Amino acid sequence: MNIKSLLLGSAAALVAASGAQAADAIVAPEPEAVEYVRVCDAYGAGYFYIPGTETCLRVHGYVRYDVKGGDDVYSGTDRNGWDKGARFALMFNTNSETELGTLGTYTQLRFNYTSNNSRHDGQYGDFSDDRDVADGGVSTGTDLQFAYITLGGFKVGIDESEFHTFTGYLGDVINDDVVAAGSYRTGKIAYTFTGGNGFSAVIALEQGGEDVDNDYTIDGYMPHVVGGLKYAGGWGSIAGVVAYDSVIEEWATKVRGDVNITDRFSVWLQGAYSSAATPNQNYGQWGGDWAVWGGAKFIAPEKATFNLQAAHDDWGKTAVTANVAYQLVPGFTITPEVSYTKFGGEWKDTVAEDNAWGGIVRFQRSF
């Protein structure tokens, strides 16, 4: 009996000790739920919330390859072979809502590669570092093409001039600015007012742009100034801009009208005038006092879009371009284009040939 009592007592003690240890044990917390990427559909397709924030981000871009032949319709020179170019563009948009309106950013990085015909007959070209790619050779480069901040109607940063953007650029062709319509990329501070009845207005202070041969940036504290008015409706739109070049103290203006004939066919016409009859300026870069551009677009029922543009300026340059943008599959478009330029009047003395025919085929994958 004593042994039996001892065994029962030992078992009871072990059970009691085990219960006490269980009561004192540390309970591990449940793992936190993983925060997966959430889709943000407030600003269109492709946006998602940055984890831990209410900011929506979109990452997109394109890869492009161009093959050019025939004449250079900008300069009138014969390429004597194929010119090729590739570009990878990477774009980032962010948007979030604040008490002052939508706060957004946009940036675009461009990685470019150009391989032009050597222009040497029967021998390889000179690809030295000091040789201009326009004379033949290989060129690579990386550009921060856009980087700006928006808050409501306010915009500040690197963008393209309101002299282009507010009126809607030119036509949907690759060689659209053979008759030039002004500089593009610029640092700027701009404000756009958008009314609820289709009316909008813009005012911008701009630093000015540059191209291969010229620098049109300001030379002091006084910026270039651009102002514009626009009205848009279901039928189309009409817009006008006036720009003041603070370096040469001259002004230029453009007026553009777009009309939607049907939901697939549209036409547009733009006229421009400059108080300084010279292309060597930031805005009125056409030849002479005035220039005119016009074009049409037809969206075919299937996968093709047809574009046509013609332009003429006061000095006698005439440029005509047509293309077909064919979407082979969603996101991949092939665009063959043909262009013609007639260098007449005062332009004849600036080019080797009066007539230039050129062609280009563009392959572009957008994502």
UniProtKB/Swiss-Prot annotation:
GO biological process entries: monoatomic ion transport
Membrane topology summary: Multi-pass membrane protein
Its job: Forms passive diffusion pores that allow small molecular weight hydrophilic materials across the outer membrane.
Localization: Cell outer membrane
Major location (coarse): membrane
Signal peptide (from-to): 1-22
Misc. remarks from the entry: The pore formed by Omp2a is larger than the one formed by Omp2b. Omp2b pores have optimal permeability to allow growth and protection against harmful compounds. The larger pore formed by Omp2a may be advantageous for intracellular growth, when the bacterium is competing with the host cell for nutrients whose concentration is particularly low within the phagosome.
UniProt key word Membrane: yes
Gene: omp2a
Single GO term (MF): porin activity
Subunit structure: Monomer.
Keywords for this protein: Cell outer membrane, Ion transport, Membrane, Porin, Signal, Transmembrane, Transmembrane beta strand, Transport
Domain notes: Consists of 16-stranded beta-barrel sheets, with large surface-exposed loops, that form a transmembrane pore at the center of each barrel. The pore is partially ocluded by a peptide loop that folds into the pore lumen.
Sequence similarity: Belongs to the alphaproteobacteria porin family.
Pfam families, per database record: Porin_2
Superkingdom to which the source organism belongs: Bacteria
Entry GO terms, CC: cell outer membrane; pore complex
Protein name: Porin Omp2a
